[in-house]
Swiss-Prot record:
Miscellaneous notes: Carbon 2 of the heme B porphyrin ring is defined according to the Fischer nomenclature.
Protein name per the record: Protoheme IX farnesyltransferase
Transmembrane regions listed in the UniProt entry: 64-84, 110-130, 133-153, 161-181, 189-209, 246-266, 287-307
Catalytic activity: heme b + (2E,6E)-farnesyl diphosphate + H2O = Fe(II)-heme o + diphosphate
One BP term from GO: heme O biosynthetic process
Function: Converts heme B (protoheme IX) to heme O by substitution of the vinyl group on carbon 2 of heme B porphyrin ring with a hydroxyethyl farnesyl side group.
Family matches, as CDD domains: PT_UbiA_Cox10
A GO cellular component entry from the record: plasma membrane
Amino acid sequence: MNSSNLENLNYKSSIRDEVVPSRKRLTLPPWLEVAKPRLIPLLLATTLGGMALTEEWPLSSPKLICTLGGGALAAAAAGALNCLWEMELDKRMTRTSKRALPAGKLSSQTVFLAAVSCTLAASMLLVSGVNYLAAGLTLLGLFSYVILYTVILKPRTTKNIVFGGVAGAIPPLVGASAATGHVGLSGWWLFGLVMLWTPAHFWALAILLKDDYASVGIPMLPSVKGSVFTAKAISRYGWATVLMSIMGVFALPEGGLLYGIMLLPFNGRLLQLINELKKSPDDLSRAKSLFRWSILYMFGICLLLLISRTQLSVEFEQQSMQIFLSIVSLLSN
């Protein structure tokens, strides 16, 4: 290997380490690592977003705690079952070989029992403290992640995250059903937004890890089609995400105007990063920037939904309407 190739390899490795810092900078206890706790906050954020889209927001504290607690337990169970299924795969990848299960820090039996316990606890919490629909949707999300995505789609098709993304899109439905006992059109809007956002978000990471996936035969889009093709696909899904996000103006029971205004910089930055990656698809630093911003983007959307349901938003809309009517009156005279 010549010096230029070695430098390029080291550069790629350093970028990957920066994007997935947990492997280098933060060591979790084995029992916590298998639960994949870094994925849980965003799932809970979109659950809150689903709640905020209903007339019943805000929920009572007991129902809110039961919904989020049940969701966190189910997500932990899904993460553990995913680790169990992919244990042999993780052993073959340098990046994942030191994880708790492939490294022998935990036994398969222990992890399986923990996953079952978390699933049962989540079900009991949601059934007793929320409702059957929220419990059923939560279990559907768990099943979708473990069976549909991990077992069926991930090892077989480059469209794995397109269809497998349904697992990550279910929490908004859980939130809406927890609040009202049914999903409603607004809940389905946020479900659709997460579905469109997921491929662009995940493929940005997959560009950085395409060599890792290729080494074990996982057909992630960048590994099979290359970075140029993937960047174009990211652009399509990114634009679809932006257009869908604007529909939140109409999905909100109130506060849509403030949401729409605050949304502009989020969408602008997302499109900017997507365009930069499209210009230089093999630039790992650009893929890293897009991946990181896409996480902040979805957190931001959920935060905007919550802000839009506050008294501040109501007052803003009232004042805006008064200003608008005053302008119309002046123009008509």
